[in-house]
Amino acid sequence: MTLGAKTAVTRFSFTTGHTPERGTAARRVVTRGTAAALILLLSLTGCDIETNTGSGTGAGAGTPGSGQGTGGGAALAAVDALAVKGRAPKTGYDRDQFGSPWADTDSNGCDTRDDILKRDLKDVRLKSDHCSVLSGSLSPDPYTDKTVAYYRGRSQVDIDHLVALSDAWQKGAQQWDASKRIALANDPLNLLAVDAGPNRSKGDGDTATWLPANKAFRCTYVARQVAVKKKYGLWVTSAEKSAMSKVLSTCPNQPLPSGGNPTSAPKRFHAG
């Protein structure tokens, strides 16, 4: 059972305007007693007071469901566990091999793109379907440390695959079944709302060929890539591994993110 924010605020509101002095003490006792009784009732029944600020949790958040928990150990140590091989040919790569874009693989009724926008943007405004994000603010953008406004249909905000799908294809994903490829394409651990410009200049670059201009975010960025490659069993090139180690050696205590979705999508999803 959940009490909505509107109900909770109403029950805990106090009058701030001037009131006659007579009877004030008695009213305060009653009001405080009512609030205390309500709190006791909630603790006994297991109810939650649900609050909604109308904003996302931000790109660096490690909240439940964000795909950004930190229970996986040190990121630098995890680099050594990644297999090292050469980049395979890009032959046969097609975005359709990873399923239709933004499939609802977590079955929450909203597509993956809107899930990530709700997670990473602030001041989020939704349509009446409670899924479609109409507007919000990427504040700050993790790649540039600037604020980028989001408006549905004409936005400068992209959802980046931290490990690009083409890069994944050339480093193991071409050997997977469709279910695993669809899972990677929609895993919150591998997705981030970012400024469209830097994202498009990144292309399918790996750590050896592209890093965000915002140096303060580089450790987090590389740790996320390491976490995704470890989770899905993707390999790295020698140059990529060296670049990962170089970045993470500047932040040896950087945690390895964990969480996200399962590594196989529900059977109802198909890929070309």
Label for each model-derived stretch:
Residues 4-34:
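Bacterial N-terminal signal peptides that target proteins for export
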Residues 35-40:
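Hydrophobic helical h-region of N-terminal Sec-dependent signal peptides
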Residues 63-142, 146, 153-154, 167:
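Cell wall/extracellular polymer interaction/catalysis modules
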Residues 142-272:
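Domain-level detector of nuclease and nuclease-like folds
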